[in-house]
């Protein structure tokens, strides 16, 4: 007779609880949480997931720390105006997690600060696809990136960037103000006025 072999595939997830909310996020091939988070119930957690504390301590945690150090290193060099060392640090972070929002913003800002619009365009295209880029925790980076797109005369990209943000949050008057500023530079006065009025309706 023939023997059937059963193969079991293990998927690793990073699970975090804040208050009553439990969220899980898949681990990428480098063992860091990456990609969209999903909210699950306590019942789901207990029935579908098994804890792996040793794997977390030996594989996941060290990689998460390495990623965090690389991003912080990049931020620190970028703030000092040392854009080439910053780029190297962000690059390293992106080899660990290419979807890391802070590293993508960081390297994008580094390119924009150097006036390297071709490379900034690549990062812009990646960022508009990452929903995480538009979350409140990254608001200051989001704003800085949008302003730098405008200052580098990447007006079309700047507008597309703010429109993408508006798909996820319609009630932020600052987005309409920022769009109006870009449209003023682009000499699109009617759209500029429309967006200013919209901003005023949201925050009279």
Where are these regions (language model features)?
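Extended, charge-rich intrinsically disordered regulatory tails
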Residues: 177, 184, 188, 196-199, ...
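Long, contiguous interaction/recruitment modules in multidomain scaffold/adaptor proteins
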Residues: 1-96, 102, 109, 119-122
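Detector for Asparagine
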Residues: 11, 20, 28-30, 58, ...
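Alpha-helical adaptor scaffolds
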Residues: 102-185
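Structural signature of alpha-solenoid helical repeat scaffolds
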Residues: 61, 95, 133-134, 167, ...
